[in-house]
Design a protein with these regions (language model features):
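Charge-dense, extended regions
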Residues: 1-45
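Extended low-polarity, hydrophobic cluster-rich segments
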Residues: 4, 132-140, 273-282
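RNase H-like nuclease fold core
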Residues: 35, 52, 57-146, 167, ...
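RNase H catalytic domain
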Residues: 86-89, 131-223, 241
Length: 291
C-alpha cells in the first residue's frame, strides 16, 4: 500500500548504508527503516556526477533492488517523470530537480531529487537536469540487464522547451545554446542508449484544479516530482553547502568542462573568457608605471 502512496516526498536522513525514512508530509504513513544500497549505484557513480544521486527514495517493497526496473524496461512498462524547481526570491543561484521511474503494471517506483548551484540556474536548466538523471539511469539499467533492444520508454516533463531540446537528434550542439553542457550529455546518452526514449509534455500543477483521483498518471507523477524538486531546493538552502564545491561539479558522462575562477561555464565560454582576459590586462596596466 505504501509503495503506491500519494506522497513521495519524505522527511528523511541519509545514513552511510542507505536512507532512513521518517513520516511523509502528506499521504500514506511510512514505516521507519533503513534500506541497504546496492553495487548498482557504485556503477552509476563511476560515470561521474555522483552529486545527482544525493537523495534516493527506493520502492518500499524492493528497496534498492533493480531487477524490477530491468524487467519493466524489457517489457516496455517503465515510465519516467521529472520536474524542476527554481525560486529566485529564495536563492537566485540554486535550482532543483525531482524524478520518478515507475512500473505502470505493478506501481513499483524509484524516486530521487538533487539540487545544483550555478550562475545559470533556472527552471529550464532544472528540468533538463531531471531528464538527464533519468536517461543516465536508463543507460545504466540497460547495461546491467544486458539489454540490446526494448520497447520505447516515455518520460513526462512539464517544460515544453526542455521536451523540445531533449527530443532533438542533432549530432552537434551549438556552444551558444543555453545549458549546452546538459544537452551534450543528453546527446551522448541518446547515442549509447539501446532504448528509444519519447519525451512528452504534461501540464503542470493540475492538482490545483482537479482532485487527486481525477488526475491522470502523468499528472500525478508530475505533482510528486514537483514536491521532490522543491524539497531539494529547500534542502540546499537549509544546509548551505559550499558554493565553491557546487560550482565545480561535472555531469555524468561529461568528459570535460570549462571553469573560470572556480565556476563551471554551461554555455558559450567566449564572453566569460573575454571578460577574464580583459580584467587581467586591465589589472596589469593599472598596476604598471604607465597606469
Amino acid at each position: 500500500e505504501a509503495a503506491c502512496g500519494q506522497c513521495i516526498s519524505l522527511t528523511c536522513d541519509v545514513s552511510p548504508t542507505g536512507v532512513v525514512y521518517g513520516s511523509p508530509t502528506t499521504g500514506h504513513a511510512w514505516s521507519a527503516y533503513t534500506v541497504p544500497l546496492t553495487g548498482f549505484w557504485d556503477y552509476v557513480k563511476e560515470w561521474g556526477g555522483d552529486w545527482m544521486w544525493e537523495m534516493i527514495y527506493p520502492d518500499l517493497g524492493h528497496g534498492f533492488d533493480i531487477d524490477w526496473m530491468i524487467s519493466a524496461l524489457q517489457a516496455g512498462t517503465l515510465v519516467g517523470a521529472t520536474d524542476g524547481s527554481y525560486d529566485r526570491s529564495r536563492n537566485a543561484f540554486v535550482c532543483g530537480a525531482g524524478w520518478i521511474i515507475m512500473d505502470t503494471t505493478t506501481g513499483d517506483r524509484l524516486a530521487g531529487s538533487f539540487s545544483e548551484h550555478s550562475p545559470t540556474a533556472g527552471s529550464y536548466r532544472a528540468e533538463l537536469l531531471g531528464l538527464c538523471a533519468i536517461n543516465v539511469l536508463l543507460l545504466a539499467l540497460s547495461k546491467a540487464g544486458n539489454i540490446s533492444s526494448c520497447p520505447s520508454i516515455t518520460i513526462w516533463c512539464d517544460n515544453k522547451g526542455a521536451v523540445s531540446r531533449a527530443s532533438e537528434n542533432s549530432r552537434r550542439i551549438q556552444s551558444g545554446r543555453s545549458c549546452a553542457d546538459i544537452l551534450r550529455v543528453l546527446r551522448t546518452l541518446r547515442m549509447e542508449l539501446p532504448v528509444p526514449v519519447t519525451f512528452i509534455h504534461v501540464h503542470s500543477h493540475m492538482d490545483d484544479k482537479l482532485s487527486w483521483e481525477q488526475l491522470s498518471l502523468e499528472q500525478q507523477l508530475n505533482c510528486q516530482c514537483d514536491t521532490l524538486a522543491k524539497d531539494s531546493v529547500s534542502r540546499y538552502i537549509l544546509n548551505q553547502t559550499s558554493n565553491v564545491t557546487r560550482n565545480q561539479r561535472l555531469l555524468p558522462k561529461e568528459a570535460a568542462g570549462i571553469f573560470v575562477q572556480g565556476t563551471k561555464l554551461t554555455s558559450d565560454p567566449t564572453t566569460a573568457l573575454r571578460y577574464l582576459l580583459g580584467k587581467h590586462a586591465a589589472k596589469q596596466f593599472l598596476c604598471s608605471e604607465q597606469g
